[in-house]
Amino acid sequence: FKIGSIMGIPVKIHITFLLILPVFALVFSINEPPLGFAGTTPLILNYALSLLTTILLFACILLHELGHSYIAKSYGVEIKDITLLLFGGVSSMEEIPRIPSQELRMAFAGPFVSFVIGVVLLVLNYIVVSFVPGYADTSIWLMFYILGSINIILGLFNLLPAFPMDGGRLLRAWYAKRMSYIKATHYAASFGKMFAVLMGILGLFFNPWLILIAFFVYIGASEEDKSTTISILLEKYI
């Protein structure tokens, strides 16, 4: 359901967002520093900081999506809405720019926003911890450290060269400078599928979460390949 608008773009939240919100807050509350607030504050304040950190994290994800949307709008692409859901955020666009240079800038805009947020939070946090007496004894510095670190990780994760991550679109834009858009999509999707299989194999030995992410990546790559091919073929006959 809709919660507001930014830059004329409706912002919505999916029911899965409401389900994941308390889960993230719980994770932050039970993990010890620097990954959480366990043992740093009284229990009620711990939960409050954990929930606030979770809300601010999804606000950062919204800014990440707004980065994509801002560049897309500058190229005349209509943005239907931005939806926050279980695994982050999604910008619904009428179409993806097929000019490689435009898609490249649009795809990189999201990770760039995440990197800027992460670096600014970590640098400011370091400066304040170093020069403001007593600040290091509070849990506020920990909240900004967590948010800064996660934004850097979010930016790096989204640069993985596989759909539906931004890195998959960057890879397609690189291919599209050298071949047709359909073929570029197919190559980028195939690379993403191989990447997902490798990630799934690693997940069997190291972390089961990698298997879930691999499944998500494989399906995303397959759907992008299929939807792009159908869209372009329909344009030729309509």
Regions found by a protein language model. Name each.
Residues 1-238:
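Hydrophobic transmembrane alpha-helices and their immediate loop junctions
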